[in-house]
């Protein structure tokens, strides 16, 4: 009896999640603690990935939170949350989505918790970052790349 050849199945696994870099600065303290608290929060985020070996990738999620109060920087918090992931038997588009959206979705709660903890340790009111839709950000990135490619070819 002949067995039908089976296509290789996609495999994904988390090998490690770790804190790669962290920084917390409160340049206006202790004067800031005496002012009325009316914060202006700015969040910048970025992702980066690189191949470590065949089918093994490091993904780094960078979050920078800048909080100003009365036009002065109350605090600046930077976190690089990283993970090592194995992703095998994926087509190029699937792999790009995995590294650009799926893995950052896994890393974000860890980065959010680190930021919240640092802010509280700086004795500022707790900061709870809203969830981020990395799938939508990734789709916007793809659309932007397509538009830039079309402009370059025109």
Curated annotation (Swiss-Prot):
Coiled-coil parts of chain: none
Protein function: One of the proteins required for the normal export of preproteins out of the cell cytoplasm. It is a molecular chaperone that binds to a subset of precursor proteins, maintaining them in a translocation-competent state. It also specifically binds to its receptor SecA.
An annotated Gene Ontology molecular function: unfolded protein binding
Lineage, opening ranks: Bacteria, Pseudomonadati, Pseudomonadota, Gammaproteobacteria, Vibrionales
The keyword tRNA-binding is annotated on this UniProt entry: no
Location in the cell: Cytoplasm
Homology family: Belongs to the SecB family.
GO cellular component: cytoplasm
Single GO biological process annotation from the record: protein tetramerization
Keyword annotations from UniProtKB, A to Z: Chaperone, Cytoplasm, Protein transport, Translocation, Transport
Source organism superkingdom: Bacteria
Subunit: Homotetramer, a dimer of dimers. One homotetramer interacts with 1 SecA dimer.
Designated name of the protein: Protein-export protein SecB
InterPro entries membership: SecB (IPR003708), SecB-like_sf (IPR035958)
SUPFAM superfamilies, per database record: SecB-like (SSF54611)
Main location: cytoplasm
């Amino acid at each position: 009896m002949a067995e039908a050849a089976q296509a290789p199945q996609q495999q994904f696994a988390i090998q490690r999640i770790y804190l790669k870099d962290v920084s917390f600065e409160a340049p206006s303290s202790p004067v800031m603690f005496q002012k009325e608290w009316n914060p202006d929060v700015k969040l910048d985020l970025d992702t980066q990935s690189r191949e470590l070996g065949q089918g093994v990738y490091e993904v780094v999620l960078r979050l920078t939170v800048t909080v100003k109060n009365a036009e002065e920087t109350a605090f600046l918090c930077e976190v690089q949350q990283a993970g090592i992931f194995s992703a095998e038997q994926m087509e190029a588009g699937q792999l790009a989505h995995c590294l650009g959206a799926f893995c950052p979705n896994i890393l974000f709660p860890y980065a959010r918790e680190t930021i919240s903890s640092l802010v509280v340790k700086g004795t500022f009111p707790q900061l709870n970052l809203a969830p981020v839709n990395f799938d939508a950000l990734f789709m916007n990135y793809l659309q932007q790349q397509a538009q830039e490619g079309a402009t370059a070819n025109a």
